[in-house]
A protein has these predicted regions:
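Stable alpha-helical structural segments in soluble proteins, enriched in small hydrophobic residues
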Residues: 76-88, 169, 274-282, 309, ...
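Glycine-/small-residue-rich "gating" segment that lines the acyl/pantetheine channel
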Residues: 123-130, 168-171, 175, 190-242, ...
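Short pre-catalytic strand/loop immediately N-terminal to key active-site residues, enriched for Gly-Thr
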Residues: 129-134, 154-161, 217-221, 321-332, ...
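Conserved beta-ketoacyl condensing-enzyme motif
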Residues: 8, 24, 29-161, 190-198, ...
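Active-site-adjacent elements of ketosynthase-type condensing enzymes
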Residues: 46-50, 109-113, 192-214, 256-273, ...
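Phosphate/pyrophosphate-binding loops at sites that engage ATP/ADP/AMP, CoA/4′-phosphopantetheine
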Residues: 84-96, 240-244, 275-291, 313, ...
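Conserved small/polar residues in nucleotide/adenosyl-binding loops
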Residues: 390-391
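Condensing-enzyme catalytic core mediating Claisen C-C bond formation in acyl metabolism
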Residues: 5-9, 32-36, 208, 212-282, ...
Length: 391
């Protein structure tokens, strides 16, 4: 058993903000939101807003044979994963990549495949499903497809924990490197939730905004869904230094908890416990954190509870923290949100710029922190914390 330091050497992102990590970061710096009116051929849906990948033509990235086995969420995962590998300066076929782990989370998996299958069977009265329906739509499909496309032959599997799926994938990769199981891991998450069945289900939850996503504001009215994938290459610090790799940030520690309570209502004790565990694991004091990338969904309950949890953990220092939610820019991409937010946090540390909370008007009386309203802020960031919750 070892205790290797773990660093981020490659980033990939595809979202409503664009098809590359550079597009993603440019939007973060400028405070541009991708939330807009949905243009989908779907009737009887109350949800009218979303953040979808702009001008996305899968045929520009994949052959017709490849598309026959790739659900939309796997397509997004492969594109972002390829970018992260290229950004890290790794080459397919090299030992460092061939032996890497591939761990990719998802909150909902291949829902486009499921929906297409249901339409064929129940609307068009087909008598059989496509023979590749199962491998195309399974929750681990993205991990398998990324592994196959990049020739990665280390362990490949998925994680599923709702909005924290990406964080858990990244933590798993970090843990495997720290323990010496592998030197390199390609990790992240992908989700593509814009299907009739999922949108009707989100309608039923009654947490979606018909205005826009305004985290921590007194007139916030709910979340706005998004789609996308965030990927990163993790390496042991020794491996990265040996090959002269660019290092965005170090993953110093993590904290994971369960509320063991209500399935949708957050418990402040679980949130505070997770942050305290992360600080302890990273050997950091609260006053060494300069930035928190918040879960910040824009719902009444989440934002107030999250703010109170930060106040409890950081005490008087909480008012000196910069806290922002990037969901107001890229939307709530379910399991992919946590991965996209860790990509944003790594970029913030590397570039010394804190992404803003856009669409910000006036803070709620229960939300009393510095939420970096509307305009990005230059700041040397010693350490940052990314908070992903499951509600």
């Amino acid at each position: 058993m070892t205790d290797n330091r773990v660093v981020i050497t490659g980033l990939g992102a595809i979202s409503g903000l664009g098809i590359t990590a550079d597009d993603f970061w440019d939007a973060m710096k400028s405070g541009r939101s991708a939330i807009q009116k949905l243009d989908l051929p779907i009737e009887n849906i109350k949800i009218s807003l979303g953040s979808t990948v702009p001008d996305f033509e899968p045929e520009n990235f994949f052959s017709s044979d490849e598309l026959s086995i790739l659900d939309r969420y796997s397509q997004l995962a492969v594109i972002a994963a390829q970018e992260a590998v290229n950004d890290a300066g790794l080459i397919c076929g090299e030992n460092i990549l061939s032996n890497a782990a591939t761990i990719i989370g998802s909150g909902c998996g291949g829902k486009h495949t499921d929906e297409d299958t249901y339409l064929q069977l129940y609307k068009h009265n087909k008598t059989r499903a496509h023979p590749l329906t199962i491998p195309k739509g399974m929750p681990s499909a993205a991990a398998s497809m990324v592994s196959m496309h990049l020739g990665i032959k280390g362990p490949a599997f998925g994680t599923a924990s709702a909005c924290a799926s990406g964080s858990h994938a990244i933590i798993q990769g970090m843990t495997m490197i720290k323990s010496g199981i592998t030197d390199t891991a390609l990790v992240g998450a992908s989700d593509a939730p814009f299907t009739y069945g999922l949108l009707k289900s989100w309608d039923a939850l009654r947490v979606a905004s018909d205005d826009t996503c305004r985290p921590f504001c007194n007139n916030r009215s709910g979340l706005v869904l998004g789609e996308g994938a965030g990927m990163m290459v993790l390496e042991s610090a020794e491996s990265a230094h040996q090959r002269g790799a660019k290092i965005y940030a170090e993953l110093a520690g993590c904290g994971m908890t369960s509320d063991a309570g209500h399935i949708t209502r957050p418990d402040i004790h679980g949130i505070t416990n997770a942050m305290e565990k992360a600080l302890h694991h990273a050997n950091l004091y609260p006053d060494e954190i300069d930035y928190i990338n918040a879960h910040g969904t824009g719902t009444l309950v989440n934002d107030a509870t999250e703010t109170e949890a930060i106040n409890r953990v950081f005490g008087v220092y909480a008012k000196k923290l910069a806290v922002s939610s990037t969901k107001a820019m890229h939307g709530h991409a379910l399991g992919a949100s946590s991965a996209l937010e860790i990509v944003a946090t790594a970029q913030a540390i590397y570039h010394g710029i804190i992404p803003p909370t856009v669409n910000f008007t006036e803070a709620d009386e229960t939300c009393d922190l510095d939420y970096v309203p509307n305009v990005a802020r230059k700041k040397d960031i010693r350490a940052a914390l990314s908070l992903s919750l499951i509600h």
